From Swiss-Prot:
One GO BP: response to oxidative stress
Residues with PTM S-bacillithiol cysteine disulfide: 31
Loss of function: phenotype: Cells lacking the operon including this gene (ytxGH-brxC) have increased S-bacillithiolation of glyceraldehyde-3-phosphate dehydrogenases (GAPDHs) GapA and GapB in cells with increased basal levels of oxidative stress due to concomitant deletion of genes encoding for catalase (katA) and alkyl hydroperoxide reductase (ahpCF).
Function: S-bacillithiolation is the formation of mixed disulfide bonds between protein thiols and the general thiol reductant bacillithiol (BSH) under oxidative stress. BSH is an equivalent of glutathione (GSH) in Firmicutes. This protein is a monothiol bacilliredoxin, which debacillithiolates (removes BSH) the S-bacillithiolated glyceraldehyde-3-phosphate dehydrogenases (GAPDHs) GapA and GapB in vivo and probably a number of other oxidized cytosolic proteins. Debacillithiolates the S-bacillithiolated Bdr (Bdr-SSB) and BrxB (BrxB-SSB) in vitro.
Subunit structure: Interacts with AbrB, BdhA, Bdr, BrxB, FolD, GapA, GapB, GatA, PfkA, PyrAA, PyrAB, PyrE, PyrG, PyrH, RpsB, RpsK, RpsL, SalA, SucC, Tuf and YtsJ.
Protein name: Monothiol bacilliredoxin BrxC
Keywords associated with the record: Oxidoreductase, Redox-active center
Post-translational modification: Cys can react with bacillithiol (BSH) to form mixed disulfides. S-bacillithiolation protects Cys residues against overoxidation by acting as a redox switch in response to oxidative stress.
Residue ranges of coiled coil: none
NCBIfam families recorded: B_thiol_YtxJ
GO molecular function: enzyme binding; oxidoreductase activity; translation elongation factor binding
Length: 108
């Protein structure tokens, strides 16, 4: 599965209610650190097409970003990545800690 842009709470809720695991990235389109994190996320998604991968652009979907922070009790940061499994945050991190290797490590 290719990575998919999510823009609404309804889309996110539909994904989060499903069984299994998925990766979710919140990023800024104007921040160089965020662009580097997106590159790592993109590399992961391209190498692991069996793992659903979603993202949002904070500037265009701030209400969704806030909803995710409130739902999971994780303070908003950007960039920020989550591994969510069966409705629970299995792992999250932000900024330069977002690497393809880190995502792979925490997925297993």
């Amino acid at each position: 599965m290719a990575k998919q842009l999510i823009q609404s709470e309804e889309e996110f809720k539909r994904i989060a209610e499903q069984e299994g695991v998925f990766v979710f990235l919140k990023h800024s389109t104007t921040c160089p650190i965020s662009q580097a994190a997106f590159h790592e996320f993109d590399a992961f998604a391209n190498q692991h097409e069996d793992v659903p991968a979603y993202y949002l652009q904070v500037q265009e979907a701030r209400p969704l970003s806030n909803f995710i922070a409130e739902t999971y009790g994780v303070k908003h940061e950007s960039p920020q990545i989550f591994i969510i499994q069966n409705g629970e945050v299995k792992w999250h991190t932000s900024h330069s800690q977002i690497t393809e290797a880190a995502i792979e490590q925490h997925l297993s």
